[in-house]
Amino acid sequence: MKKSKGLFYAGIVGIVVALVIGVAVIMMSKRSGGGNAATHDGTVKITCYGGSEKEDFINDPQVKKILREKYGVEVNFIAKGSYKQVQIPADELKANKVDCLWPSSASAQAVFEESGSSKAFGNDYQAASVLQSPEVLYANTEAAEGLKNAGIVQVRDNVYFIVDFRKLLEEYLLPGKSWADLAVAVPSGPVLINSSDPATSNSGMTLAQLELATTASGNPYQPASTAQAGASLAKVKALIEAQGLMRTGSNSAFEQWIIQQTGGLLAGYENQLLQWITTRNAGAVPAGIVTLYPEPTIFNDHPILTLTAAAKKLIAAIEDDAIQDIAWTRYGFRPGTRVLEQVFPGVTVPPTHTIKKTQAPGYAVIKLLLDCFVTNHC
């Protein structure tokens, strides 16, 4: 009898210990931040908000295979505008169990850090630029030729460069000139540069930064100071508002422009046309579309901002040579970790070292631009 009682109590103790261990494991998992749970094979699932132009890339079957088999990570990618994601309060990010942000520029990263949000994540916060893509303007061939005839665009080695962005802005856009003034029949109407909404999306904000540098500082290679920016915000706001309704993300803005064959000018990333060619157009270059490289342009970094320890795996994974190769050959992202030969089937792309570049403005100027676009405080 005593022996059976002993066994009974031992069983009870065993059950209690098992329950305590189970509860402890659950609590530790919850405290880990992003709510990332390991699958039966040990793979960690993380949730990441990122720019829409990276959605096809991160969901590429081969990329997902490398992430899972080599790095033990699976990504739930939720497309969200760069400036929208970095302005989400830290408490809300934690409540929604977000493990990382993946905006499309160092400017968006600066907003997250300078606002103090990054500090809320302590040592789990890490930032690393893993991909790059220069800001470009897309044009239909007739519009590009009209700009070339006006001395605004030059063609060198089969690549179109905007060599006089100031002339384009001050002699055509700001005065409200029409495409007919450039002897262009398609498109009709005023000369505009369309973009995604700069209040939420990085490609639109980068266009605004280029416009600001050109109109404010007098030297496009010199980012505008706060004083210069303040004096020119109204001009930039007018250029943006002239577009009318804007898409909230870079990807939807590009897809609308190319599918509807809108013509004219669209600001975006170099990779968007290259990605369209490989993933949507069976490797064929769409007829009648030209990529224009502003001189200078801004190279958009695509930094991963980790909010939990588990998300740090993603940085190492995207820096993997095999994934960097896929990023370029299938999705047109220039590598953020090493130098690759810039050769893309059917398209002439300028080598990185030959592209004339300028820097984005500092945080104070970015904040002025955001306040202007979001709250109309210009």
What are these language model-derived features?
Residues M1-K30, T39-H40, L307-C378:
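Extracellular/periplasmic juxtamembrane helices and adjacent flexible linkers that interface
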Residues N36-S188, L368-C378:
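N-terminal segment of the mature folded domain
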Residues E53-N59, A199-S217:
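Bilobed "Venus flytrap"/periplasmic-binding protein-like clamshell domains
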Residues A127-L137, L233-I240, N281-K312:
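Periplasmic-binding protein-like
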Residues A143-K148, A216-Q222, A309-K313:
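Short helix-loop capping/hinge motifs at secondary-structure junctions, enriched
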Residues V153-L173, L192-A199, P303-L340:
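Bilobed periplasmic-binding protein/Venus flytrap-like ligand-binding cleft at the lobe interface
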Residues R166-T200, S232-T248:
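Alpha-helix-centered segments that form part of catalytic cores
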Residues T206-V290:
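Ligand-binding pocket segment of bilobal, Venus flytrap-like solute-binding proteins
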